[in-house]
A protein has these predicted regions:
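Residue-identity detector for glycine
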Residues: 2, 6-7, 12, 16
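Domain-level signature for proteins that mediate thiol-based redox and metal-cofactor handling
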Residues: 11, 17-215
Length: 215
């Protein structure tokens, strides 16, 4: 990637990751299939378990880091994965300058070893619990278990590579409902990923699945 005068790599000019070494901390950045989203890898674990998606400044109040990123302006989404943070910019945002601001926020946060979440929100740090799934037919319990297992082992790692995440929401009459998060939310190619990638995979491993839809 070509660098501008300020040393911040221009997004989208060349494929592959960019490395930013700041005060002895190496942060890797990667583009994603969603042109509005950039993936930041701080070289350490972000979420020990599960993921967390913030779609507004109000939701970000649960996390000092997410709140700081939203406070930069031109940010419409923040997503925490196992070892990465995806940041989605608003329409017309200039990533060439915004990226440097995000890197500074990440450096401040991790250098100070600050908590990822405020204590009052500790119960909500991971993927929504099982009881948040949509109601399903008890007779489908085995099918649902298979869907969740394949989603965790086959689908989640793939979408995480693209800076996104998925959450199982329900299964009804052959249709699986999944919520797309991070870079996958609002991505121009998310529909194709859902239909041609995830749907094909789940139909292969779980014959009872006839369709996959976005929740």
């Amino acid at each position: 990637m070509r660098s501008d005068a300020g040393g911040i790599d221009k997004i989208g000019l060349a494929p592959g990751p960019a490395l930013h070494q700041i005060a002895c901390m190496l942060i890797e950045t990667e583009t994603t299939p969603n042109p509005a989203t950039l993936k930041f890898l701080p070289g350490r674990t972000v979420m020990e378990m599960g993921t967390r998606d913030f779609a507004s400044p109000e939701e970000a109040e649960a996390s000092p880091l997410a709140e700081a990123i939203f406070s930069l302006g031109d940010v419409t989404g923040v997503f925490f994965g196992h070892n990465f943070i995806s940041v989605t910019s608003g329409p017309g945002a200039d990533w060439s300058s915004l990226k440097g601001d995000v890197l500074s926020v990440l450096l401040d946060h991790f250098s100070a070893d600050m908590p990822l979440f405020r204590a009052a929100s500790a119960a909500g740090i991971s993927v929504p619990p099982e009881d948040s799934d949509w109601p399903s037919n008890p007779e489908d319990a085995d099918i649902v278990a298979q869907i969740k297992e394949r989603s965790e082992t086959r689908v989640r790692p793939a979408v995480a590579n693209d800076g996104g995440g998925i959450v199982y929401r329900g299964f009804d009459k052959g249709v699986v409902y999944l919520q797309m998060q991070g870079a996958c939310s609002g991505c121009p190619s998310s529909s194709a990923t859902l239909k041609h990638g995830i749907e094909s995979l789940l139909k292969h491993y779980v014959p009872e699945v006839t369709e996959v839809r976005a929740a």
